[in-house]
């Protein structure tokens, strides 16, 4: 029985990157042999075992054969005669198809180290096309390693395009698409993930609402980059550079979906695109089963982002109603996420990436003002329904004073 560290841990070890998850493959063993040594079986579809002490995953070396549609459509074969090379060839990329024994010797039958040196993401074999999930995985790797100059091999991108055109992507479950996409959104270059999907024709299959933004013009005085799709990815890039959370990144991604629905005769203006965007944002969230908290912020940013840009010119009552819709009294963290997303929208424009966005602090200061006015601050004779009415009155008056201070030269 021989044990090898495989996959991402070997890749990151060779790159000098930290890694936390370790996967092992066991060659020359049977399930009974591992069970007799105290390993606990956990795999339903194929033999995966937990180490009795470390609880790390150990999988018996296996081969696989395509037997159906999608990423579940495989039959697996495993016994003590399966060789390490046979197990590694079923993996997606050469840089993920390396193994290392306990002495530190690296086994690299498919040129993974060479591709690491040349910064190439390359498929191991033509069997790559048998698993549609690999389109998303490779796009995610492209996003993860963009900082280091990695590029997808032309022939691999061609295979990804073949998968996209084959209809196999339709077999991916919404949960799996969202799992890969949410992980990609948290990479430093999440925009590369979506650009890669577009480059291989997968974006229009998995995210047609986002794909349809490309080619839609905007007014150049507000959007020097002109193209709506380009703006969306530029705004997402801003969210990544600021290291904002998943909720903000997703909201930025879908904030302008309504622009794809603008009547042709109105272009390049996008009147009411905020309202038009609510339906496609809802459809994306429902289709992918996006968590409710993320959906809530995405809809809010879609509907209200222009109000944030106009914040300093809003009347006190209008500003108060905006803060109310943002649930300012119960969820200050949502207000913070909202202004973060809106700032990314404002800065995700060609040549305007570094311009100030004072509206963000203006909204946050206004939030603190209204939150600091509480029922116990009212005169004692105010009771019953009057309390709510007076709180609103006091808050709007405080916002009026706040606005006046900002308006003064």
What positions do the PLM features span?
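Catalytic cores of the polymerase beta-like nucleotidyltransferase superfamily
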Residues: 1-409
